[in-house]
Amino acid sequence: MSGKGGKAGSAAKASQSRSAKAGLTFPVGRVHRLLRKGNYAQRIGSGAPVYLTAVLEYLAAEILELAGNAARDNKKTRIIPRHLQLAIRNDDELNKLLGNVTIAQGGVLPNIHANLLPKKSAKATKASQEL
């Protein structure tokens, strides 16, 4: 025996990715590589890519959920850039975060200035008062 304890001859455990260890879907290893190659700092800690990956995954899930709701409201089954635009611009926090972002083929929010709306006629007002 080597004196390290444990069972002799036990099979080696299969390696587990950092994404799986953190319970994430987005790739932690790729984010770590991009942080190293991007020259953001001389050294990158081991927890930084995990945290950044979790933030990216959360933001993507949040935007996709709101965009899916916008697509469903428009009776569509496929999310298009218009749905992303509506989702982001109708949410206060996302609109603040992505305020300077232009989404290609996103369009604009529907908005009609109050001065341009038709004025209520006197006949319609009189008729409603008589009832």
UniProtKB/Swiss-Prot annotation:
Core component of nucleosome which plays a central role in DNA double strand break (DSB) repair. Nucleosomes wrap and compact DNA into chromatin, limiting DNA accessibility to the cellular machineries which require DNA as a template. Histones thereby play a central role in transcription regulation, DNA repair, DNA replication and chromosomal stability. DNA accessibility is regulated via a complex set of post-translational modifications of histones, also called histone code, and nucleosome remodeling. It comes from Eremothecium gossypii (strain ATCC 10895 / CBS 109.51 / FGSC 9923 / NRRL Y-1056). This is Histone H2A.2. GO terms for molecular function: DNA binding; protein heterodimerization activity; structural constituent of chromatin. Pfam families: Histone (PF00125), Histone_H2A_C (PF16211). The modification N5-methylglutamine is found at Q105. There is a cross-link at K126 (Glycyl lysine isopeptide (Lys-Gly) (interchain with G-Cter in SUMO)). Phosphorylated to form H2AS128ph (gamma-H2A) in response to DNA double-strand breaks (DSBs) generated by exogenous genotoxic agents and by stalled replication forks. Phosphorylation is dependent on the DNA damage checkpoint kinases MEC1/ATR and TEL1/ATM, spreads on either side of a detected DSB site and may mark the surrounding chromatin for recruitment of proteins required for DNA damage signaling and repair. Sumoylation on Lys-126 may lead to transcriptional repression. The modification N6-acetyllysine is found at K4, K7.
